[in-house]
Regions:
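Pepsin/retropepsin-fold aspartyl endopeptidases
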Residues: 1-120
Length: 120
């Protein structure tokens, strides 16, 4: 299968340039996040159809916030592509987070030294 190696950034996190509906989008990879989440600006830029209701209650470090639901036609990291991916949209946050709903679709993922390795 496909393997993608992502180097650890100087901030100690793993950042990746993914394609959402074919458009480049920078994500923080966060195995502590259940769902992949983007900010409203990103959702608009990549053409996500976002639900009107913000009916997803999500617990964050700042308490519980409401988010809207969307689906990406495609979400691609390196050569690993997934279709019809559920994404939460945060109204006031511009941090894009690649969460477990993407990571758990992989055959395997691991951190080895300063590398995150994704295997499809």
């Amino acid at each position: 299968g496909e393997q993608v190696r992502i180097p650890m950034a100087v901030d100690g996190h793993f950042w990746v340039e993914a394609l959402v509906n074919g458009k480049p989008t920078r994500f923080l990879i966060d195995s502590g996040a259940t769902m992949t989440t983007v900010g409203r600006n990103t959702a608009d830029l990549v053409g996500l159809r976002v639900s009107e209701e913000r009916n997803q209650l999500v617990r964050t470090g700042n308490g519980v916030i409401r988010m809207a639901n969307a689906r990406a036609q495609t979400l691609e990291v390196g050569g690993i592509a997934r279709e019809n991916v559920r994404i939460f949209v945060a109204e006031n946050d511009d941090l894009n987070v690649l969460g477990m709903n993407f990571l758990s679709s992989l055959r395997r993922w691991s951190v080895e030294g300063r590398w995150l390795i994704l295997e499809a």
